[in-house]
Each structure stands twice: as structure tokens, then as C-alpha cells.
């Protein structure tokens, strides 16, 4: 009897994982339709104080939106990574400024260490009542949407490319991250 229950639970878990993976895959391409006041770029890994490709793609997409629409501030997020001497947010700001973004238009949030904190702390800077465009890689869109809704952030999503070398890994990892997010919400740790 116990074996049947365990098998059933495993089947339910696998079915749920497949459904979540499909949601992640089919929500990977987003373009905004409104006029946000701020762009939030969640942090990602850096190497030698420079954004790695996933973060560069996010920043390139934010820059693209900024150059076309202007009149927005960009909030870069992320604390200092292990082995780095500046924060992810500062590395991102430096990259955007090197592309031609006015330094006064980039605000850094340098304390967040995960996606939930990225969004929460960034929206605290300008206020939850503002409208945000959140720019991240395609694999991240579904979870960012869930977190933003949970935190009460008015938002739209703008998806950046995902580097090919991390594509499969990140899409699979995202399902685990969604399960973890659900666990944190249920246990009140968000």
C-alpha cells in the first residue's frame, strides 16, 4: 500500500514538473505594450567584474528598450558575487554606461542575492505604485511574473535572449526554482 502511494506521489510530481516546464517554455518570449517608468534588470553572474553573457543579454535588451522609448530609469540589481570586487548591479551599470546610457538614468540596488530580493528591493526604490518593465532571459519570464504578482508589483515583461550554452540547464533548473518558490510562499518565508 505504501509503495502505491509513493508511486502515485512520484507520478503527480512528475506530471506537475512537466506542466511547469511547458509553462516556462511557452512564456519565454515577452514584449511590453505599456509605458513603464522604470526598467528592472535582475542580477546574474559576473566574471572579472564584467557581466557574463546571460546578464549582458538582459542589459542589451534593456538598452534596446531605453534607446527606443527613453524617459525611463534603469534599476540594476544584485549584490557582490564571490570572487568579485564590485556588485552585479555596479557591473551592470558600468556596462550600460559603456553602451551610452546616461549614468544618471541607472540606479543600482546592491543588496539583493536572489530573484525575489532583486524584484522586491528594486521596486522599493521607486515604490510599488510605479509601473515596471522587468527584463530578463526567456527562461526566467514565468517565475518573474509569479514573483512580481505575489509582491504586488505593477509590471510588464521583456525577454532577452538566453545563451545557447546554458539554455537546457536553465530551463530545467527553472522548474526546481518554481517548486522552491512555491515552498517559500506556502511556508511564509517570502
Give the label of every model feature segment.
Residues 25-172:
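A structural signal for short, hydrophobic/glycine-enriched beta-strand patches
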Residues 1-37, 184, 190:
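N-terminal membrane-anchoring alpha-helices
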Residues 167-190:
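A transmembrane-helix-recognition feature enriched in membrane-embedded lipid enzymes
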Amino acid at each position: 500500500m505504501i509503495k502505491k502511494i509513493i508511486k502515485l506521489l512520484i507520478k503527480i510530481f512528475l506530471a506537475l514538473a512537466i506542466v511547469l516546464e511547458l509553462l516556462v517554455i511557452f512564456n519565454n518570449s515577452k514584449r511590453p505594450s505599456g509605458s513603464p517608468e522604470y526598467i528592472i534588470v535582475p542580477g546574474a553572474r559576473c566574471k572579472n567584474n564584467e557581466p557574463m553573457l546571460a546578464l549582458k543579454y538582459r542589459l542589451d535588451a534593456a538598452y534596446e528598450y531605453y534607446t527606443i522609448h527613453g524617459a525611463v530609469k534603469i534599476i540594476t540589481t544584485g549584490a557582490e558575487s564571490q570572487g568579485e570586487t564590485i556588485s552585479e548591479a555596479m557591473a551592470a551599470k558600468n556596462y550600460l554606461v559603456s553602451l551610452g546610457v546616461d549614468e544618471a538614468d541607472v540606479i543600482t540596488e546592491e543588496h539583493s542575492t536572489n530573484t525575489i530580493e532583486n524584484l522586491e528591493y528594486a521596486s522599493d526604490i521607486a515604490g510599488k505604485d510605479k509601473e515596471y518593465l522587468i527584463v530578463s532571459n526567456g527562461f526566467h519570464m514565468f517565475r518573474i511574473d509569479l514573483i512580481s504578482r505575489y509582491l504586488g508589483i505593477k509590471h510588464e515583461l521583456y525577454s532577452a535572449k538566453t545563451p545557447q550554452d546554458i539554455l537546457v540547464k536553465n530551463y530545467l533548473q527553472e522548474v526546481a526554482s518554481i517548486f522552491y518558490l512555491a515552498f517559500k510562499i506556502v511556508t511564509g518565508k517570502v
